[in-house]
Amino acid sequence: MASRGVNKVILVGNLGQDPEVRYMPSGGAVANLTLATSESWRDKQTGEMKEQTEWHRVVMFGKLAEVAGEYLRKGSQVYIEGQLRTRKWTDQSGQERYTTEINVPQIGGVMQMLGGRQGGGAPAGGQQQGGWGQPQQPQQPQGGNQFSGGAQSRPQQSAPAPSNEPPMDFDDDIPF
């Protein structure tokens, strides 16, 4: 069997704004996200730390789009698996335009929320938040934060053991 190629995109990044969810005439949900990924390195000549941020357009469909609209907010960290797609349209002046997006279909696409819940609520996984110095019992993984379109099922990974360190403040690390 001849291989026709592989079109798979995996991103881990932070949302630049709240997802925009719309519904098609058929009733299916579509969510548009803007995802930032950053990489940093040390300049060999100056020794200075450099950083480059890439912005990605992500389009989700179906239940994944609904979940994204309900739970993701600006700054949320998320893992995305999808496919690279370029689409063409004609703008109001009659000029053809192109855009390249990461397409996360309802079947075969994956979206997993990373980090804790934004805006105060209980931490992800339903753990009770204790003091930083108090020992905590490991919780059984509750799931509920990984969503896939259903084409493939992945084994649930166990949550990392709680540490005695204070939670990290990711707001300082977000480039927007």
Swiss-Prot record:
This is Single-stranded DNA-binding protein 1. A motif (Important for interaction with partner proteins) lies at residues 171-176. Homotetramer. Keywords: DNA damage, DNA recombination, DNA repair, DNA replication, DNA-binding. InterPro entries: NA-bd_OB-fold, Primosome_PriB/ssb, ssDNA-bd. Residues 116-133 have a biased composition (Gly residues). Residues 134-150 have a biased composition (Low complexity). GO terms for molecular function: enzyme activator activity; single-stranded DNA binding. Signal peptide: none annotated. NCBIfam families: PRK09010.1 (NF006533), ssb (TIGR00621). The lineage of its organism: Bacteria, Pseudomonadati, Pseudomonadota, Gammaproteobacteria, Enterobacterales. Pfam families: SSB. The keyword DNA-binding applies. Residues 151-161 have a biased composition (Polar residues). GO terms for cellular component: nucleoid. Residues 111-176 are annotated as: Disordered. One of its GO terms (biological process) is DNA replication. SUPFAM superfamilies: Nucleic acid-binding proteins. Plays an important role in DNA replication, recombination and repair. Binds to ssDNA and to an array of partner proteins to recruit them to their sites of action during DNA metabolism. It comes from the Bacteria. Residues 6-111 form the SSB domain.
